[in-house]
């Protein structure tokens, strides 16, 4: 029969805290805190590359063997993204919101067809990079940092809790993790500013993170070998993540709707979720 995991044993890391909490505290220190956080973003990029390297096995019979994405797999991913997006659009359309938010949501919803098309195009475009097992629920709260040494470690590899085990195990583009972490930096800067810190650029943190990841992953089978493919996947998966966030915030945290909504508005204005 098929084997399974009964229990796992994890290392205890004394004195550690989540990188989310640590980063919020850093940003309260204004300029110095942001400079330190830029350095940390580079470390997160390096760590993420190491994580993805650890999640592959060159043995073709292994459950962690990389696979070449096929057209049916890409189309299935695109269909799942578009179906999910349509559910979010329906939820947002029916939500009871303040008049200013209602107006912004309606403006965004008037472009939902073009957003759906962009999702499909990004994921079904020609891909040279292999699909692998990924973290699946990757954000700043999933990284522990020991403040004294600045050592960082990834935790919680269970994947998205609302998905089935088979879905969590499904191999996909590493840009699922990269987009999720990139969006986490946007949330971080929003929350820091809301609690009194200066306005900081999430896009700069994302660029530093991605540049460090590129250095650590250059030549890896899961990393695209051309800029066009990299940007298409980044935009596609960030768009998918922002849509997920919008649905979540409409349901559970209306005070946070502005974060994903601003990202989607930015995309409609410039074709990118990152500020230029």
For each predicted feature, which ranges?
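Charge-rich, acidic-biased intrinsically disordered regions
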Residues: 64-82, 105, 224-238, 263-267, ...
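An alpha-helical support segment within catalytic cores of ATP-dependent transferases
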Residues: 88-133
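Conserved ATP-binding subdomain of kinase catalytic cores across diverse folds
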Residues: 1-91, 148-209, 214-220, 226-227
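ATP/Mg2+ or Mg2+-diphosphate-binding catalytic cores
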Residues: 199-200, 204-222, 232-276
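Short amphipathic alpha-helical coiled-coil/interface segments
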Residues: 78-85, 108-116, 206, 264
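Conserved catalytic-loop position in the HRD/HxD motif
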Residues: 137
């Amino acid at each position: 029969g098929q084997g399974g995991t009964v229990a796992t044993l994890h290392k205890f890391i004394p004195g550690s805290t989540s990188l989310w909490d640590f980063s919020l505290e850093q940003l309260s220190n204004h300029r110095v805190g942001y400079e330190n956080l830029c350095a940390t973003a580079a470390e997160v990029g390096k760590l993420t590359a190491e994580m993805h390297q650890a999640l592959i096995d060159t043995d073709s019979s292994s459950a962690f063997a990389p696979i070449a994405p096929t057209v049916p797999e890409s189309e299935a991913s695109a269909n799942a993204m578009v179906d999910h997006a349509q559910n979010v659009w329906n939820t947002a359309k029916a939500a009871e919101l303040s008049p200013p938010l209602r107006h912004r949501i309606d403006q965004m919803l008037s472009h939902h067809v073009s957003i759906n098309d962009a999702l499909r195009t990004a994921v079904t475009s020609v891909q040279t990079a292999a699909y692998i097992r990924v973290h699946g629920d990757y954000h700043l709260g999933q990284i522990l940092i020991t403040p004294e040494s600045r050592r960082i470690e990834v935790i919680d590899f269970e994947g998205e809790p609302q998905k089935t085990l088979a879905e969590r195990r499904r191999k996909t583009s590493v840009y699922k993790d990269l987009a999720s972490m990139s969006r986490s930096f946007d949330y971080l800067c929003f929350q820091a500013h809301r609690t009194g810190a200066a306005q900081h650029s999430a896009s700069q943190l994302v660029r530093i993170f991605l540049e460090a990841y590129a250095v650590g992953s250059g030549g890896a089978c899961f990393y695209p070998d051309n800029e066009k493919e990299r940007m298409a996947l980044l935009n596609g998966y960030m768009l998918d993540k922002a849509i997920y966030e919008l649905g979540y915030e409409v349901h559970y945290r209306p005070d946070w709707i502005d974060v994903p909504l601003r990202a989607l508005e930015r995309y409609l204005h410039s074709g990118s979720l990152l500020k230029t």
